[in-house]
Curated annotation (Swiss-Prot):
Positions marked as site (Transition state stabilizer): 261, 265
Gene: Rce1
Residues the record lists as N-acetylalanine modifications: 2
GO-annotated biological processes: CAAX-box protein maturation; CAAX-box protein processing
Name of the protein: CAAX prenyl protease 2
The organism's place on the tree of life at top rank: Eukaryota
Higher taxonomy: Eukaryota, Metazoa, Chordata, Craniata, Vertebrata
Species the sequence originates in: Mus musculus (Mouse)
């Protein structure tokens, strides 16, 4: 080695090939294949989720307890099997996340308390106007309301109500698991985190088109109004899906999106028209404006990744040679 001298050592150091990113599939000729596998996997998950709702033939409406029980069983089975799709995607693409599958999907203990509280607080701030409206229209005062909320009998009644279980527990948990925890890790290496935030909700929004079938079957309104309603529902579910995808990436946890989803299901779409006709219209409209303003002001600080520890999706992109700074910092 001494005979090589300084020039020889420099020559060896120059000629040594640099270590390539772990997943050449994302930067080489196979990048198209990786994206096709990711998109097809997400499409398959969405079809499986929606299709599971219709494996049970029934003439009863969707809100009938028997229908809710059967459909809840179906989506719980599909969502519990959905991580297998991520495993298959990992094998087909050769991508190694560097963390366990559960961690990648947002099941981890690091930073779990702020991840459960801060996104929900942020969402409640956004709904400041509707919460004020709910409080003004409630016949009971704050003390009586808290007694009802904290009473074990109230919770027991909720836990035996199939519609409440579907809207507040089963739908938020299974939808966030399938459409966020499973789809985002597969889409992010292909599209990057920013585009994935807006691509993932498209599957979520389209998945809600199946409500058209229910409405047409029972002729709940005219065909035109059904399709207008479906288009509106697609729009706001896609926007909501982008928001929970943003929360999932910025916190690295599934619990925040699930709790926010449950809260939004309880609140429903803000009744702006009712607020415009309310006897206390101006305080309500001020509450709506203040809520939106505070939400935009606090969106970045309350989702600062430093509050939640390491971010699995950001680590995944680092290992694949991609650089993401906007959502990861």
């Amino acid at each position: 080695m001494a005979a090589l001298g300084g020039d020889g050592l420099r020559l060896l150091s120059v000629s040594r090939p640099e270590r390539q990113p772990e997943s050449a599939a994302l930067s080489g000729p196979g990048s198209g294949l990786c994206c096709w596998v990711s998109v097809f996997s997400c499409f398959s998950l969405a079809c499986s989720y929606v299709g599971s709702l219709y494996v049970w033939k029934s003439e009863l409406p969707r809100d009938h307890p028997a229908v809710i029980k059967r459909r809840s069983t179906s989506v719980l089975v599909v969502s519990s099997l959905s991580p297998l799709c991520v495993l298959l995607w990992r094998e087909l693409t050769g991508i190694q996340p560097g963390t366990s599958l559960l961690t990648l999907m947002g099941f981890r203990l690091e930073g779990i308390f702020p991840a459960a509280l801060l996104p929900l607080l942020l969402t409640m701030i956004l709904f400041l106007g509707p919460l004020m409206q709910l409080s003004m229209d409630c016949p009971c005062d704050l003390t009586d309301g808290l007694k009802v909320v904290l009473a074990p009998r109230s919770w027991a009644r909720c836990l035996t109500d199939m519609r409440w279980l579907r809207n507040q527990v089963i739908a938020p948990l299974t939808e966030e698991l399938v459409f966020r925890a499973c789809m985002l890790p597969m889409l992010a290496p292909c599209t990057g985190l920013g585009p994935a935030v807006f691509t993932c909700p498209l599957f979520f929004g389209v998945a809600h088109f199946h409500h058209i079938i229910e409405q047409l079957r029972f002729r709940q309104s005219s065909v035109g109004s059904i399709f207008v309603s479906a288009a509106f529902q697609f729009s706001y579910t896609a926007v909501f899906g982008a928001y929970t995808a943003f929360l999932f990436i910025r916190t690295g946890h599934l619990i925040g999106p699930v709790l926010c989803h449950s809260f939004c299901n309880y609140m429903g779409f803000p009744a702006v028209c009712a607020a415009l006709e309310h006897p206390q219209k101006w305080p309500l409209l001020a509450g709506y404006a203040l809520g939106v303003g505070l939400f935009l002001l606090l969106l970045q600080p309350l989702t600062d990744p430093k509050l939640y520890g390491s971010l699995p999706l950001c680590m995944l992109l680092e290992r694949t040679g991609a650089s993401e700074t906007l959502l990861c910092s």
